[in-house]
Amino acid sequence: MKQYNAKNILNIAIAGHSGSGKTSLAEAIIYTCGGSERLGKVSEGNTILDCDPEEIKRKSSVVAATAPVEWKNHKINLIDTPGLFDFEGGLYEGVRAADSVLITVSGKSGVCVGTEKAVAAADKRGLTKIFFVNGLCDESARFYRVFENLKASFGPSVCPVVVPYIVDGQADCYVNLLEYKAYKLSLIHISEPTRQ
């Protein structure tokens, strides 16, 4: 990895409730950015970020772990934080080192206690937050219900930037509302934008 000026380095904590897909999202980002030749899976115990034997056994993070990726002339340090309350100190460590916090929210469960703790930790440090509604491939996931749940919990400043286009209960593509572009997804690979 090349050397970067401080202005081109971002530290992003990935936080949220246990089981909301923090490590899986981080692994997808690492893979998409070319930081790994394979997509690590928590269920298979082969992720870059959960490499401790206890984490592999639990299928859950117990410490904050960092992985750097390169994207558009920036170095982004992803800080994967634990969601289990027994290891809550890892959440605060990760948020303390971060410039912003990406908060994963389950598309099935919505806002949970871990979501609230992540928001409170980010707010205490005055950090920017972005919510990522995860697990939308599951047919019981409901993006718009979770979005309304987020607004009810954290106020009207919660606004969508990228939303799924749902067909027959499945996310068919994603629409970037700022760019007015739709992106078709095939597993982890994102195609070029198409006009819809």
Question: What residue spans do the PLM features occupy?
Answer:
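Residue-level detector of conserved catalytic or cofactor/ligand-binding positions
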Residues: S186-Q196
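A secondary-structure boundary/capping signal
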Residues: A65, T81, F132-N134, E179
